[in-house]
Design a protein with these regions (language model features):
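Central antiparallel beta-sheet cores of small beta-barrel/beta-sandwich binding domains
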Residues: 5-91, 103-105, 114-116
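Residue-level recognition of beta-strand termini and adjacent short loop/turns
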Residues: 94-98
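Intrinsically disordered/low-complexity terminal segments and short unstructured peptides
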Residues: 100, 108-109
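Short, low-complexity, Pro/Ser/Thr/Gly-rich segments in the mature regions of secreted, periplasmic
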Residues: 110-120
Length: 120
């Protein structure tokens, strides 16, 4: 389906910065962001799980972005690779309309995703 919302669409793993003694990313994910109709977005899993890869299925809920007071800054709810929710002290930013940064400061981890071009 076509959308005029520049945030909606597919986002693919770009890179990460993390301390593996605090956290290990569960894969090189492809995600879909879909508007929730209230200024936020549902984050849906598409592909790329490495941890418990057989249990992750396309379109499963991977997280949510909730709007904050700053433009392009969101509070983040995340479902980790083992299906555990992470909801405190985490946030997300979208820069240049093309880079989604998920920040987990207490886990010394940042994951970045790039917006995939829309195919017509």
């Amino acid at each position: 389906a076509s959308t005029s919302d520049p945030i909606e669409g597919y986002w693919t793993y770009l890179d990460r910065a993390n301390d593996p003694s605090y956290a290990r990313p569960g894969g090189r994910y492809t995600l879909a962001l879909v508007s929730d109709g209230a200024g936020g977005y549902d984050i849906l899993y598409v592909d790329g799980a490495q941890t418990l890869a057989d249990r992750w299925k396309p379109l499963m809920l991977k997280g949510r972005l909730r709007p904050g007071i700053f433009e392009n800054h969101y509070s983040l709810e995340w479902i980790d690779a083992e299906f555990e929710p992470v909801t405190e002290d985490i946030h997300a930013d979208i820069s240049q309309g093309a880079i989604l940064t998920l920040s987990f400061p207490l886990l010394k981890t940042t994951l970045r995703f790039s917006k995939m071009p829309v195919r017509h």
